[in-house]
UniProtKB/Swiss-Prot annotation:
Residues 228-322 form the Spaetzle domain. GO terms for cellular component: extracellular region; extracellular space. Disulfide bonds join C230-C288, C267-C319, C274-C321. During the immune response, cleaved in the same manner by SPE. Extracellular forms of isoform 8.19 and isoform 11.7 are glycosylated. Gene3D superfamilies: Cystine-knot cytokines (2.10.90.10). It holds the Pfam family Spaetzle. This is Protein spaetzle. Glycans are attached at N48, N114, N164. Changing C318 to S/T: Reduced phenotypic rescue of a mutant. Residues 162-174 have a biased composition (Basic and acidic residues). The gene is spz. The keyword Glycoprotein applies. Residues 56-82, 152-174 are annotated as: Disordered.
Length: 326
């Protein structure tokens, strides 16, 4: 059973409900009109000032609009037409000041305070227009035969000379017919060594005193009952350029007056199977390998002034059959 206190509270609530239920509808309408501006136009207008003098503010166009500038020149006090499909929001500061957020047809939001146009968002076109324009090169444009650009030719850097110590794929002369793996008997732009005659004669005479005799250039074979598993060729060469021990190319002193002869032996089929490979066990893979030795030669300095120095070069010495397992 309800206590007297709850009964009294319930009666008060009933009286309040009856009071609000019987409140005249026109009183609600009067209050709403004081707080909001009621219009039948399309769009929404919120938080307008309650003063009777507060106008329904139109939305001005952007200041950089050429059409708007032309209208302002013709009439100093233009009244822009209202774009009714924009959403406008007014402030509650005072009757002659207002703050609006408007959405343009392209979806961009804008701020307007006392007819001052402030953009909140930038369209894609505006963002693209602010991007720096890359510099144009003659290759990026159409060039007509009579244009000055067609007559312009950018300066070209001179071709690099053949360096002494580069790992070039073809360090020898272009017309070299017998290019060896480690030496060139003919090179382009070989220097004139006449200025080094005194130094070559006094300091490097030992390099030009050897008198090697050419040997048989046929494949190495022993007696009638001997045969090597890898075929090779012996040569006596006078190289003008060679591969050093550090795998860089360098010019070698070799001309009509000062000659350095070296004897080399190269594999006919380097990294190829040895002869009689089928007779080896299946677990072994016989391969012909080129072996090298080092020999010191009088060479031309790689950089700086023309000079003679000593350097070690890789000399192909023999061809051996090596067994690989697996």
């Amino acid at each position: 059973m309800m206590t007297p206190m709850w009964i009294s509270l319930f009666k008060v609530l009933l009286l309040l409900f009856a009071f609000f239920a019987t409140y005249e509808a026109k009183e609600y309408e009067r209050i709403i009109k004081e707080l909001f501006t009621i219009t039948n136009d399309e769009g929404v207008v919120l938080f307008n000032t309650s003063a009777d003098s507060a106008p329904f503010m139109p939305i001005p166009t952007q200041h950089d609009d050429p059409t708007q500038k032309q209208k302002q020149n013709q009439n100093q006090s233009p009244i822009p037409e209202t774009n009714r499909h924009y959403h406008q929001y007014h402030s509650l500061i005072q009757p002659d000041q207002y703050f609006k957020v408007q959405r343009s047809p392209n979806g961009k939001l804008n701020l307007v305070f006392n007819d001052t146009f402030v953009s909140l968002q930038r369209t894609d076109t505006e963002v693209q227009s602010e991007q720096p324009i890359p510099p144009r090169h003659p290759s990026d444009t159409f060039v007509f035969p009579d244009s000055p650009i067609a007559k312009y030719r950018p300066p070209q850097s001179p071709a690099r000379p053949l360096r002494n110590d580069t790992k070039e794929h073809n360090p020898c002369a272009k017309d070299e017919s017998q290019h060896l793996r480690n030496f060139c008997t003919n090179v382009d732009d070989y220097p004139d060594l006449s200025g080094l005659t005194h130094k070559l004669k006094n300091n490097f005479a030992k390099f030009f005193s050897n008198d090697l005799q050419p040997t048989d250039v046929s494949s190495r074979v022993g007696g009638s009952d001997e045969r090597f598993l890898c075929r090779s060729i012996r040569k006596l060469v006078y190289p003008k350029k060679g591969l050093r021990a550090d795998d860089t190319w360098q010019l070698i002193v070799n001309n009509d007056e000062y000659k350095q002869a070296i004897q080399i032996e190269e594999c006919e089929g380097a990294d190829q199977p040895c002869d009689f490979a089928a007779n080896f066990p299946q677990s072994y893979n016989p391969i012909c390998k080129q072996h090298y030795t080092q020999q010191t030669l009088a060479s031309i300095k790689s950089d700086g002034e023309l000079d003679v120095v000593q350097n070690s070069f890789k000399i192909p010495s023999c061809c051996k059959c090596a067994l690989k397992t697996g």
